[in-house]
Regions:
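Helix-helix packing/entry segments at the starts of transmembrane helices
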Residues: 39-41, 80, 98-105, 173-196, ...
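Specific transmembrane alpha-helical segments of multi-pass solute transporters/efflux pumps
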Residues: 17-25, 51-103, 139, 226-244
Length: 299
C-alpha cells in the first residue's frame, strides 16, 4: 500500500479510470435512481468520509473558510451540484460514449474562458489545441452529418453535457481565487455546499413526480459515485499532483475520454461510429497539443 501511495502513475491512471467510469455509471443509473436524487445523495454520502479525512485540516482552516463562505457556496453549486445534475440528466438522453468525449472539452473551455473573462494569454499551440478539441465536440454534436450541423439539430443530451462542461470549466477558472487552505479543507467545504444546494433540486424532483425509488442497481450506482468520483479519485489526484506537480499530472486528463469510450463500447455495448473515432482523435489530440503548448510540468 505504501509503494502504491508513492506511485504517481498508478494513482493518476486509477483516478482517470474512476472518472471515465462515471459516464458508464451515469448511463446505468437511468431508470434506477432519479438524477437530482443521485446528485443530492451522492454529496450527502461523500461528505462522511471527506469530513472524517479532512477533520485535522478543517480545524486549522475553519476561520478562513468561514470568511469565504460565499465563494465556497458558489463553487460547490457550480462545479459540483450544477455539473453533476446536468451530467445525470444528460445521461438519460445521450450515450456514455458522447458523455465521455464531450467531457474531454473541459480543458479547452478553461483556456477559452480564462482568455475571455480574465484576459489570460495563451500560446499558439494552446489555441490550436482548444480549436482541435472543440472540433471534436462539434463532430459528436453533429453526429458526422453536416446537414445536422447546418440546421443546428443537436441531441438534447449532448447540449446538456456541453453546458455541464462549461459550468465545470467556470469552476476550474474560479479555483484561481481559492482561499489559502489545504486541498482537503477546500474539498470538504465545497462538498458541503454541494449537498446543501442540491437538496432543493431533490425536493423539486419529488414534487414534480420525477422521483424514482432507487433499485438495487440505483443504490450500487449511488455508492460508486459517492465513494469513487466524489472522494477516492479526489484524494488520489491530490496525491498525484503532490508527487509530480500539476502540469505533469494534468496530462493524464487525456486518458479520460479514451478510457470512457473503451468502457462504453466494451461494458455497455454502445455502437462506435466513424464520427466517434474522428471526435475522439480530435479531442485527445487537442488536449495533448494544448498541454504541450502550456509547457507541461513547468506550470
Amino acid at each position: 500500500m505504501q509503494s502504491a501511495w508513492a506511485n504517481p502513475i498508478l494513482l493518476l491512471v486509477l483516478t482517470t479510470l474512476i472518472w471515465a467510469g462515471h459516464s458508464i455509471v451515469g448511463r446505468l443509473a437511468v431508470d434506477q435512481i432519479g438524477p437530482m436524487t443521485l446528485t443530492c445523495l451522492r454529496w450527502g454520502i461523500a461528505l462522511i468520509p471527506i469530513l472524517l479525512t479532512a477533520r485535522p485540516a478543517l480545524r486549522r482552516d475553519w476561520p478562513v473558510l468561514r470568511t469565504h463562505w460565499r465563494y465556497m457556496a458558489a463553487m460547490g453549486a457550480l462545479g459540483y451540484t450544477g455539473f453533476n445534475a446536468l451530467f445525470y440528466v444528460a445521461a438519460h438522453r445521450t450515450s456514455a460514449l458522447n458523455l465521455s468525449i464531450i467531457q474531454g472539452a473541459i480543458p479547452a473551455l478553461v483556456l477559452i474562458g480564462a482568455r475571455l473573462f480574465l484576459g489570460a494569454r495563451f500560446t499558439a499551440l494552446q489555441g490550436l489545441g482548444a480549436l482541435t478539441t472543440m472540433a471534436g465536440v462539434v463532430a459528436i454534436a453533429a453526429q458526422g452529418d453536416l446537414n445536422r450541423l447546418a440546421a443546428l439539430a443537436f441531441n438534447g443530451g449532448d447540449v446538456m453535457m456541453f453546458i455541464a462542461a462549461i459550468l465545470y470549466a467556470g469552476y476550474t477558472i474560479g479555483l484561481r481565487e481559492r482561499p489559502h487552505v489545504s486541498g482537503l479543507s477546500l474539498l470538504a467545504g465545497m462538498a458541503l455546499a454541494a449537498f446543501i444546494t442540491s437538496v432543493p433540486l431533490m425536493i423539486w424532483e419529488i414534487a414534480a413526480g420525477g422521483f424514482i425509488w432507487p433499485t438495487a442497481a440505483g443504490y450500487a450506482t449511488l455508492v460508486y459515485v459517492a465513494l469513487g468520483p466524489a472522494f477516492v479519485s479526489q484524494i488520489m489526484f491530490m496525491r498525484g499532483v503532490e508527487l509530480i506537480g500539476p502540469g505533469r499530472a494534468g496530462v493524464f486528463v487525456n486518458l479520460v475520454p479514451a478510457f470512457g469510450a473503451i468502457m462504453a463500447v466494451v461494458i455497455l455495448g454502445e455502437p462506435f461510429a466513424a464520427y466517434h473515432v474522428v471526435a475522439l482523435i480530435l479531442v485527445v489530440s487537442g488536449i495533448a497539443i494544448a498541454q504541450r503548448g502550456s509547457g507541461g510540468g513547468r506550470h
